[in-house]
Amino acid sequence: KPGIPVGVPKGKALELRDFQHWSDTLLAKYPHALQSNDEAPDAVEVYRKTLAAQPDKSVTIVTVGFLTNLGNLLQSKADKYSSLSGKQLVKKKVKILVCMAGMFPSGSEFNVNRDASASQQVYNNWPTPVLLSGFEIGQKIHTGLPLINNSSIVNSPVKDVFRISIPLDKQDSAGRMSWDETAVLVAVKGYKPWYKLERGKMIVADNGSNTWDTTKKNHAQLPGAPPQSIVRDSSLLYPMYCC
């Protein structure tokens, strides 16, 4: 979909290389307006501009990666888009934050531990409801193979990523584990009828590991094994690849 604002972190941020090289393929195959990160605006500016223009309590933010940009957003100051601080702006405009993050009831998960300070900033200070889809939720739901085998879908960046990456990892032989997709599913369609919520609070240690404090109710997570309806019918996630 064209016209989606894109921002990048302009300060300290992780740099990870794509060892499977699907990103190289996408850049070579598909047109794109930005030639480098230097041409993109600061992600915090994109967030502030976008949030300021939305109705109050109307925005669902879904994150399927590191919390770097959201941590920076919370610490941002008033600017030309809003007289509110980052935390005030989030509280006014955001309805819920949905995250693919953490491992429950405890563990160490990639999206949280690689930028532990940003994760602590977000989970200690985010002023709206937070819903977490943990590692264990997407681990048993495999997707991608139906998309790869569907010859009617052409010129699809998402299909290309699955086509390139799945054969390169033995654990993906039955399909890619669907960590990010499950978070997007509940962000777009809600957690019902597939899940119930468990209230608590995500606690992130300095080393990036996490625990779940059931005595507090700031956050919610999707407990237990994924419903068999999702495991059996990954077409619940399939439309995300085609839109």
PLM regions and their residue ranges:
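N-terminal acidic, glycine/proline-rich low-complexity segments
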Residues: 1-243
